[in-house]
Amino acid sequence: MKENNYLELIKNANVYAVAKKSSLDHAVLISSKLNNTVLLKREDKQRTFSFKVRGAFNKINQLSTKELENGVICSSAGNHAQGVALASKINKNSAKVVMPITSPSIKIDAVKSLGAEVILHGDNYDEAFTKAKEIEKKESSVFIHPFDDPYVIAGQGTIAKEIIEEFEGDLDAIFVPIGGGGLISGIASYVKESGKNIKIIGVEPEDSASMKLALKAGKPVTLDHVGIFADGVAVRKVGEETFNLCKKYVDDIITVNTDEICAAIQSIYEDTRSIVEPAGALSVAGINQYVLKNNESGKTFVGINCGANVNFDRLRHIAERSAVGKKSEVLLAVEINEEPGSFKKFCESIGKRNITEFNYRYSDKASARVFVGISLDGRSDDKKNIISQIKDSGYIVYDLSDNEMAKLHVRHMVGGRTSIVGEHIFRFEFPERPGALLDFLNSIGQDWNISLFHYRNHGSDFGRILAGIQADPEQMNLLNEHLAQLGYRYWEETSNKAYSMFLG
């Protein structure tokens, strides 16, 4: 299929039997804060709370009766699965959906409620995809690709058509989340082939920037690791077709971190009173970063709110991280003298500021350590001023605002330091499913003494553990070999300042 057919494919796409023309809402608070007009394309309002139903239905609608005799099959952890299930229900064809075992129950139940058969297999999308392709071959069903298909791309492209038709003024840029590239390929194709002078800017998480890496390499490449916080865009390798379209039409791709995504979720909530999923907040996170880095003002930007399928129990983690992402909170570790009145004196050095978190623990006869969170007033130099103010009062201060171990674990563990010979600290990620914690402990084995352990379920696809393991110097090679064989992603954090100050 020729690339120049996409404009017509999008114009002729059949999506409105299952999708609605989502609203283009003015984000008043975000616009005011950024001194630009920001419009939100509310795909989170679709029946399945995601744009994915557009492409799924358009693809299925192109299939003949004979092709649909054995039904359709797809692999997905959530949004595409619901799109295929709903499209199949409307089209009255059978559907099977292979989902990872780690998929949230809310998404599994949603797919089942739409009449599709759910097959749980594997710990991640790649394993589910392999299983789906096996079933496709065995049963002669039709595989509905989540992004690398012309009709799927065209279905997603109808979003751009709606934006152009609804907004009568000049648009400067459309910010689009990128996973496999289907959404941005459709939007970019329609905008550019229509001759519109509108920038198309993709937004990816820093830890799953598969399209940015592909464009840099000149071809789709496979990521060694995919971050799973923004699970809706956690794709290890982009498609061939989507890569070609992005290479031709996309003006820029920027990446954002977890804290920026959480801050964007909060910003969208404050403007709309709606909670989007992490992937759904990517575009706003991108707009915020783009405006601040380029000092933009007076422009008009559109952000695609691509989905709202977020587990309720993830909101605690999102709320904790959003303050740092919005630069509205600083996390500090402070050493103070251990003497009568020193704690009160330290509090006075902070002044009349809003304290968001305060953990204090006796360390030894000479000193104590404080883990403190302090609200910022929004000025770019406020964090610097706070740190200088505390240092000027004679305290040693360490900024932990960007310290992943401190934010995930240590803030919940402040309770006293101890000296354990040969203790080494490691941070682990493992697929979150029933029994996963016990599986992790069994895999560590009984040959190593665990001296510290902290696990917290963030309501995501992966669990996170901080563990202390004792090993003599001559045992370190053996320990590293053992950990490498476990198959879990891990980082050594023994030299992390948060550990040495509060736990080590």
Label the predicted regions.
Residues M1-A436, F440-G504:
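PLP-dependent amino-acid enzyme catalytic core
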